[in-house]
């Protein structure tokens, strides 16, 4: 049974409140506290706790930049099959796309994943700008521990299309006078705390990490895992194995609140590192670089292996991409020109490379790029509209990508070849329009030195 009128418990006690049921009453140390880090402390560092107030999410939903300036409403033209959107008017100020620009009369189902505590009873009618209290906590602790089951398509093992987030979960919200928490510990005393094996299963993550819009699979980290060797029973890894490893703590509740010492292996971290975690990104793939003199110049080979990630890299949001930049210097000639090999596309940014503009430089991109069916805009961030996938060069689990570049050779002297693999959260132009300050992250780098006086190769 599920009580639709249940009031979610806050993860943190609101300031000035005498709330005694907040999760933080037992599971929070706080910066001024002593003792081990507890689950709510870790949850505060987790991006899930910020999903309702994430400025990228909010500005993409509203069609504004971070200063609140709004793009003009979308223009439409009539076709034989109905109305079709037009590209933005280049004569008008523009601050990037927005769901509400294209759909002014409804809020969509974005809240089903980003604001689930509010959307659970109104999945198609939750405006993220109007939520408050526990509903603005993103993915609250109480929400996760009320999930009892996930509805998946038996034929595919995936959530049903168009059933994101709360639309694919089954909840157990208690009625007045009772409480209920589902969790991963199987040795708790019988009562309102209940063991759920789902809490340690990747299926728990599926509804918010698989998204289909207009028949196009836009984000699919759960499906990518499901199709990879990581999903194999026995010797595979679950999402939780990587994103909720053991925290090393012996308590998950304060001792004075009844917390018992446990085997640290049974207590998992609630930080859930993801796309903003430097350690995770820098341990996702491997990069190697080789260079050798050739009759026609300097031949450079790169190899990137997705050897440590159980899904594609990058994954989920199609705005994310990796940029491999390969450059050669030396021999008194400054930067050496590329004679043959791939170069980076215009959307990597035109201008000074010191400012993150890499268009035209030797390199490769790893991206799932979408094109709007109506407007032809590509790359597009408005994936709520009908789109098609125009390229997908991301690295699958255990996949190797090899690149080859030929640079002009100097007459003599040392030549240094550098390769840098960057993680970029969104297309550069979009970030400029929205005012997002998201510096590139160096995931991997490598360098090699060639001495053209003796033809000696010195790896760095």
Residue ranges and their predicted role:
Residues 3-6, 11-26:
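Short, contiguous pre-domain boundary segments
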Residues 411-413:
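Surface-exposed, short loops/turns at beta-strand junctions within beta-sandwich domains
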Residues 1-11, 32-90, 97, 123-397, ...:
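Primarily the internal scaffold of c-type cytochrome electron-transfer domains
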Residues 94-99, 103:
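Flexible glycine-rich active-site/ligand-binding loops centered on an Asp-His dyad
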Residues 105, 109-115, 205-209:
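Extended, loop-rich substrate-binding clefts of extracytoplasmic carbohydrate-active enzymes
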Residues 95, 112, 116-123:
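Conserved, well-structured interaction surfaces
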Residues 16-21, 103, 107, 138-141, ...:
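Residues immediately within or flanking Cys/His clusters that coordinate Zn2+
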